[in-house]
UniProtKB/Swiss-Prot annotation:
Protein's name in the database: L-lactate dehydrogenase
Catalysed conversion reaction: (S)-lactate + A = pyruvate + AH2
Keywords: Cell inner membrane, Cell membrane, Flavoprotein, FMN, Membrane, Oxidoreductase
UniProt keyword annotation of Cell membrane present: yes
Primary enzyme class: oxidoreductase
Cofactor(s) the protein needs: FMN
Domain FMN hydroxy acid dehydrogenase residue range list: 1-380
Described function: Catalyzes the conversion of L-lactate to pyruvate. Is coupled to the respiratory chain.
Subcellular localization: Cell inner membrane
One function term, GO molecular function aspect: FMN binding
Amino acid sequence: MIISSASDYREAARRRVPPFMFHYADGGSYAEQTLARNVSDLENIALRQRVLKDMSELDTSIELFGEKLSMPTILAPVGACGMYARRGEVQAAQAADNKGVPFTLSTVSICPIEEVAPAIKRPMWFQLYVLKDRGFMKNALERAKAAGCSTLVFTVDMPTPGARYRDMHSGMSGPYKEIRRVLQGFTHPFWAYDVGIKGKPHTLGNVSTYMGRQIGLDDYIGWLTENFDPSISWKDLEWIREFWEGPMVIKGILDPEDAKDAVRFGADGIVVSNHGGRQLDGVLSSARALPPIADAVKGDIKIIADSGIRNGLDIVRMLALGADATMLGRAFVYALGAAGRQGVENMLDIFKKEMRVAMTLTSNRTIADIKPEALVDLSKL
């Protein structure tokens, strides 16, 4: 099929990847209201076109935590990303590296830190959950530091897993899930060969390395449910700082008071995020949560936004709403599932081109020029 946008990659991934993996990325929690709102709230914000300004010199690059990014985006941490393409985390990291943006490795990746880090030139970011096993957390931080990871992304909106009903229907969880996955593999032969056979081992690489035994996909949801720690508090940041001296970003902030706490406890950045609508359904979209958070802490801490970004125009919208940078999750997973590393590289090219068009026609030469005045909220008209 012809690929011209991220939505095309979604359709290509739907055809190529078996349902249990496609819907794991595509779905949200409960009735998926927040998942839908993340997208629709961005769509309801129009860009203010401005003309007759010299836009011959345009720059999409930024500097973030001492790193030069070719565009204001980071590939977000995605669990089990290695199930979308053969050794998928390596391919996605190489694509990001080639396009000049950071890749964030998930705690629950298929490929371990030690496999991904040597495959790229620029330092990757590493994402960490608060887990009951503090020994694992300490081990993961030490390994990330030894591998040269530059920034820690500390995810705080998963003290307990969200209820993702779609996963039960698709075969990721629910009754007879193993049999259903095998049958789906038969109807998706390319994926079955490329990932199912050539992409082994299908284990949680970082966890398996620490445990000294294989923690496979069948154990994935159960392991997470058993190990997420509902006692998570701001004091955990102090504990993490004992083992991590580099930049630390708190992911999962939706309230201005939490953003202020992140500043007070010494975080270097926050990610305004509702986990892509995969945790608590019914919460604010990131687009709606972002402006009051920016009003509260802009300039005191770096603000990154994710959830609902489907094209380069959405990146510009998030920047105008107050973000310093953005994270992409589903968009790159669709591209990875559809076409591997080349798909992710092409997706980033598409987003960058869309950004450049939007910046040109809103008369913003640099990322720093993008302000709230570039937007019109259609819901208020």
